[in-house]
């Protein structure tokens, strides 16, 4: 396993079940041990960002809401109570190692809308320059099912790539990736290293999540695809033991995901990491080949348009068999895209009634994903 001390900027994600016990509340001893690990890495020159789940779980414990399913407004109220307690706990724990901390609450638009993405990145960068540890969570007090990340694994990957982290560590209640969910298959084999997240690797993930958290192995692999495509390595390991980061240093079990050899950079990192494409364009075999060779997507190659998107939105591009092969910023809104799908460039102006762009998605706004999980700028 790779030593954490070789990395200069590390994003660490903590699952709810690690931080919160339903009976006793916050696991302070565990949190203190993790904060001590962070202090060791910081003293070695690393910059650490924390993505911390647990606000709703902690809030429902404080409020005595029990195990029943919560209504949306109850979850948001629990998050409000839990978040203030969680922020204080992080401040106290990190302060033991003379580390300052700052709370960042994000909603989906803060990473998916370009201007807000740049603003969030600037704020977090300033915290790091000031030697403060950013403690980041989704703003569950205002997020709804339609406008939320849904899990902090993908949020952590989005933060890691936004901030140019060279390592993402997902601490969970499972110690890595297996050939099948170990709870279902006692013969499942542990996988120490993943070179690329292929469809075969994705098939190994079960959909089940912990009782207190929303994520499962599938969301962790989704996070891995986002992170590794941008050149960020990833580790999945158990956080149930004390001092979980130093446990990695000691060689405890963990799965290491290698970063892409051809990572997406800069502007295209934002496009590639979009979590919720506004629509989908299904293309023909000829367009698949053109995209793979670095060309723009022309209307002639588009066979099906789905979704209600506007010009400039991110859309997913699907192959004839339904696999996602690229993402890009579309040059037309959905209504016009439907009208010109399948048309040659010379026919577009006649149909739309105005001089329009020749490409549905220009190559400069396009990120092509290749088999095996690598992504290139096209």
Swiss-Prot record:
Substrate binds at residues 53, 140, 152. One of its GO terms (cellular component) is cytosol. InterPro entries: AceGlu_kinase-like_sf, Asp/Glu/Uridylate_kinase, G5K_ProB, Glu/AcGlu_kinase, Glu_5kinase, Glu_5kinase/COase_Synthase, Glutamate_5-kinase_CS, PUA. Pfam families: AA_kinase, PUA. It comes from the Bacteria. ATP binds at residues 13, 172-173. It catalyses: L-glutamate + ATP = L-glutamyl 5-phosphate + ADP. Residues 278-355 form the PUA domain. HAMAP family: ProB. Catalyzes the transfer of a phosphate group to glutamate to form L-glutamate 5-phosphate. This is Glutamate 5-kinase 1. The gene is proB1.
């Amino acid at each position: 396993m790779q030593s954490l001390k070789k990395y200069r900027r590390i994003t660490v994600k903590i699952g709810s079940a690690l931080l919160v016990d339903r009976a006793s509340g916050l696991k302070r001893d565990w949190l203190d041990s993790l904060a001590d690990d962070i202090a060791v890495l910081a003293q070695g020159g690393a910059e650490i960002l924390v993505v911390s789940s647990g606000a709703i779980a902690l809030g429902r414990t404080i409020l005595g809401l029990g195990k029943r399913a919560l209504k949306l407004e109850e979850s948001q109220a629990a998050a409000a109570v839990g978040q203030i307690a969680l922020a204080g706990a992080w401040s106290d724990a990190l302060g033991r190692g003379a580390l300052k901390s700052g709370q960042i609450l994000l909603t989906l638009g803060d990473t998916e809308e370009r201007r807000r993405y740049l603003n969030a990145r600037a704020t977090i960068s300033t915290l790091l320059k000031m030697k403060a540890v950013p403690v980041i969570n989704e703003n569950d007090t205002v997020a709804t099912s339609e406008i939320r990340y849904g899990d902090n694994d993908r949020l952590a990957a989005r933060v890691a790539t936004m901030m140019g982290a060279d390592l993402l560590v997902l601490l969970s209640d499972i110690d890595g990736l297996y050939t099948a969910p170990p709870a279902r298959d006692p013969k499942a084999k542990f996988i120490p290293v993943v070179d690329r997240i292929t469809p075969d690797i994705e098939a190994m993930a079960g959909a089940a999540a912990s009782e207190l958290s929303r994520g499962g192995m599938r969301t962790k692999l989704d996070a891995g695809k986002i992170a590794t495509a941008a050149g960020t390595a990833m580790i999945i390991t158990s956080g149930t033991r004390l001092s979980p980061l130093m446990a990695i240093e000691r060689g405890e079990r963990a799965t290491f995901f290698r970063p892409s050899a051809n990572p997406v950079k800069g502007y295209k990192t934002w496009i590639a990491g979009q979590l919720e494409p506004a629509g989908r364009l299904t293309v023909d075999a000829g367009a698949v080949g053109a995209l793979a060779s670095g060309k723009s997507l022309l209307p002639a190659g588009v066979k099906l348009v789905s979704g209600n998107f506007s010009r400039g939105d991110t859309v997913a591009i699907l192959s004839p068999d339904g696999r996602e092969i690229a993402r890009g910023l579309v040059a037309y809104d959905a209504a016009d895209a439907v009208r010109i799908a399948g048309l040659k460039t010379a026919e577009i102006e006649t149909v739309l009634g105005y001089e329009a762009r020749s490409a549905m998605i220009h190559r400069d706004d396009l990120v092509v994903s290749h088999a095996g999980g690598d992504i290139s700028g096209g």
